[in-house]
Amino acid sequence: TVKAYLAKDALGEYAIPAIRQRPILLMGPPGIGKTQVMEQVARECGVALVAYTITHHTRQSAVGLPFIRQRNYGGKDVSVTEYTMSEIIASIYAKMEATGLSEGILFIDEINCVSETLAPTMLQFLQCKTFGNQAVPAGWVIVAAGNPPEYNKSVRDFDIVTLDRVRRMDIE
């Protein structure tokens, strides 16, 4: 699936446009090697890999920190809240600069164990490929991983709408 998402046509455009690429969801017991599988896939495809265990993150590190900026709307000065770049998105750009690779895999582990405050952000991420107002760069495939509920009591079940937006692969 990663190779298919990264394949380009004769004009150099992605054969499957990013908007049609559903994130891949790997489900399997802890310690089975989901992260190692993604490391191998990245090596074989010749792309970068940025891996995050999302349970170690807060909403602020995922969407960015808020700051106040002065704007003028309709001749009236107002204060508006904007956000810094997401730590996760910034890591993708840092990896691109460090490796010289413009394509890669963003691997988010333990996605179904996120805190209640981060769950809506993860749903937006899976649906829109964004963290806050920043999109995952073109050429980056989203892969998430999780554990079935029988292996982890803090697992949140994905609703049918979310499952419809991912390409689930069970690993045993």
Q: Language-model features: where?
A:
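AAA+ P-loop NTPase catalytic core and its hallmark functional loops
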Residues: T1-E172
